[in-house]
Design a protein with these regions (language model features):
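Structured interaction patches on ligand/partner-binding surfaces of diverse proteins
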Residues: 35-61
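Solvent-exposed loop/turn segments flanking beta-strands in beta-repeat/beta-sandwich domains
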Residues: 1, 87-110
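A short, solvent-exposed beta-strand micro-motif common in secreted/extracellular proteins
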Residues: 17, 23-38
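Beta-strand-rich modules
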Residues: 134-156
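A glycine-anchored, Pro-Gly-centered beta-turn/N-cap motif
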Residues: 24-27, 123, 141
């Protein structure tokens, strides 16, 4: 179809990587953002023909993944452990972070407490954070935490599942 027949609309991925949009039937062009995300940069254009409920997958290759994660709260110490797997052979870890928030929306930019680790390698990683003197954390009715891992050169981290601490 001609370029003028293609509809344009911005769509944003959620924290779990999914995205959705309510669209009319017709041709669409999905253009990924350049140098965005915790994965190998691969600017791409995907043409999608929407007819009713339509699914579209955008495949990416993360620099790292996180597995076997666990986060606990005991005596004002938040302790996290995970296994960081290296997916891209020459990727290096910029930092790992333990992030705490009052809501399930917790990431590098949205948190009320954090502990960063640098100079780490893939494999089992332990990270802890003393929240004794953090009034924001102490006064929170609910606490959630997750671990993030950011690769050198990436603008975002890859994240673990979210754990409810209280």
């Amino acid at each position: 179809s001609a370029a003028s027949d293609v509809y344009k609309r911005q769509v944003y991925a959620t924290q779990d990587g999914t995205f959705s949009a309510v669209l009319f039937d017709g041709p669409y062009k999905l253009v990924t953002k350049d140098k965005n995300g915790p994965w190998v940069n691969n600017r791409d254009t995907i043409y999608v023909e929407v007819k009713g409920k339509t699914q579209c997958e955008v495949k990416v290759t993360p620099y790292f993944t996180i597995s076997d994660e666990n986060i606990t709260l005991d005596n004002n110490i938040v302790s996290g452990t995970c296994n960081i797997q290296q997916i891209v052979q020459d990727a290096k870890i910029s930092q790992a972070m333990l992030l705490v928030s009052k809501t399930t929306f917790v990431d590098e930019n949205t948190n009320i407490a954090r502990q960063n680790l640098s100079n780490i390698n893939p494999g089992v990683t332990n990270i802890s954070l003393d929240i004794t003197s953090n009034q924001n954390v102490q006064s929170a009715k609910a606490l959630f935490a997750r671990i993030g891992v950011k690769a050198n050169g990436a603008d975002q981290a890859v994240y673990s599942e979210i754990f409810r601490l209280k």
